[in-house]
Amino acid sequence: RVLKARLSDSHFIWKTDTSITIKNLNKKLKNVLFYQGLGSLYEKTIRLSKVSKCFSSLFNVDETLAKEASLLSKFDLVSEMVAEFPELQGIMGSYFTKLDGKSKEVSIAISEHYKPKGISDEMPTTNLGAMLSMIDNIDTLTGFFIINKKPTGSKDPFALRRAGFSIVQILMKFKLNISISDLFTESFNSYKNS
């Protein structure tokens, strides 16, 4: 009985979410704060799209797909499904973009960009997913360092160490030869220009 009610709720939420266009969900990100002093989640996606131009060739991905994946990477966070089931972030974005006719590459990248979640977690399998994951983590690290919210020996409330480990894991797995300072310079410039 409980399972049936839960499934019925999920079906209703799915119908509600899929009745709203991705474009309108994405606009809602303008009203969702990433963090005080770091702008909205919408602004974060704009920064990601700017930085993606610099790194798409490094990852050997199409610049247009990189920009699209960056701009759509967070819209599912304002969906009812992710509000109800937060562990589905990225996964729902992938489903919604497939349903909307977006490319398979973009859908997979949206799902993969939260990987890896830890040192022993699954890695992105696609170049586009890896690039999006890396620039998202770089944006987060850069932003929190700009506002002086650095991790300490005993505290890391924003999981910045995990973000740093994720960047290193991606660089190693995809055998990317790039200066870490170049990565952060591009990200810093995207904050400066937003």
Identify the role of each PLM range:
Residues 1-194:
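Amphipathic alpha-helical "coupling" segments that flank catalytic cores
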